[in-house]
Amino acid sequence: MKVTVLKKKGKKEVINRFELNDLAAAIQDGQMMHTVKHTREIYHLMNPHRLADGQVSTQWEGGVKLPRICFAADYQTQKGKWRMIDYNGLVVLEVNDLQTYEKAVEVRELAKKLPETMLCFLGGSGRSVKIVCRGELYGGGLPKEEEQIRQFHLNIYNTARSAYQNQFNFDIEFLEPRLD
């Protein structure tokens, strides 16, 4: 199963496609650790806020240098436009604005123990946790039509959010689940 990783190169976003296992190994091995550490050191100065397209904007020159990961689908660019190659049924829950790094680690460790969790990791701020889950249609498989994919994606996001809220015993902010 492939996911899409977007890196800013100047004013362009460059798409790279990775197998989920390879991306998980890169996160676990700390291949981005230098960039993550630098981001965490200055994050409190950045005044970050989320844009409508899902990106995080900052008032810091150069912005956040971490790549953006699209877990929901495998994309490629064709004549400058994004084209979905394959929807993979992955949804990301974001547990944001935790009080401390230690609390984020605690939430990550709890999420790792739940059978629905495919992958979880700390966000760039060190005070958030990203939890990746997968859904399937009853009987297996995934929807193929764009509108069915959007509805299915929203449904699995809401189901996952509800399940994790019950396990964590606190509210997880609703963030519109995105396919890109």
Predicted segment positions?
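DNA replication initiation modules
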Residues: V3-K11, G80-E102, E136-D180
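Short amphipathic alpha-helix segments
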Residues: L98-E116
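Short regulatory "switch" loops immediately downstream of catalytic or recognition motifs
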Residues: N47-H49, Y75, R134-L142
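Hydrophobic, Leu/Ile/Phe/Ala-enriched alpha-helical segments that form helix-helix packing faces
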Residues: M46, R50, Q55, A111-P115, ...
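Beta-strand-rich binding-surface signature
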Residues: L90, L114, S128
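An amphipathic, hydrophobic-aromatic interaction surface with interspersed Lys/Arg
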Residues: T117-F121
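Short, conserved phosphate-binding/catalytic loop or strand-edge motifs used
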Residues: G123-Y138
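DNA replication initiation on ssDNA origins
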Residues: M1-G89
